[in-house]
């Protein structure tokens, strides 16, 4: 995941363990491969949009079976036409923020409605989460999030350097 993201891939969906649902569903109905069946606690699924100029999605499903053998299923989905704007899920952003200790979003422009709504939804998943915002438009993003109902006490400016928007949990 981190290697693909370092190459510019955008993480759209990420689940682990029981959050992914039934491994039987993934193995048999989605991927059509019974060898991917195993304990739900030992599974992970990622969906990424590959970096431009590719208009492709990459799906990765990994599981460690009861016999301790690890399996990884990878599918690249190449689009026949340019893909529309695709945003990650709020749960994916929260999982990434917790795991990596920060979110670096390539949001170089002023706030837009779609991303503002997504970030508000992400913050609603954890009402105790406080964030530090940094980046060239961090102040504008903080204002946009506050206008959509996020309490000012949950958002703190940490600088205007750097491209995009960086979010870091505050303790």
Labelled PLM ranges:
Residues 125-135:
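Short glycine-rich, basic-tinged beta-strand/loop micro-motifs
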Residues 152-156:
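A glycine-rich helix N-cap at a beta->alpha junction
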Residues 1-125, 139-148, 159-171:
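An acidic-aromatic pocket/loop used at catalytic or ligand-binding sites
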């Amino acid at each position: 995941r981190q290697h693909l993201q370092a190459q510019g891939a955008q993480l759209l969906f990420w689940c682990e363990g029981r959050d992914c649902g039934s491994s039987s569903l993934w193995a048999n109905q989605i991927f059509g491969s019974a060898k991917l069946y195993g304990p739900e606690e030992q599974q992970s699924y990622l969906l990424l949009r590959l970096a431009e100029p590719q208009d492709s999605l990459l799906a990765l499903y990994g599981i460690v079976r009861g016999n301790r053998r690890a399996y990884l299923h990878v599918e690249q989905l190449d689009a026949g036409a340019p893909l529309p704007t695709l945003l990650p899920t709020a749960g994916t952003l929260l999982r990434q923020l917790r795991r990596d200790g920060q979110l670096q979003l390539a949001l170089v422009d002023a706030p837009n409605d779609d991303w503002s709504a997504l970030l508000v939804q992400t913050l609603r998943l954890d009402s105790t989460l406080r964030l530090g915002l940094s980046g060239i438009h961090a102040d504008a993003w903080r204002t946009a999030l506050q206008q959509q109902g996020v309490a000012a006490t949950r958002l703190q400016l940490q600088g205007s350097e750097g491209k995009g928007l960086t979010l870091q949990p505050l303790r």
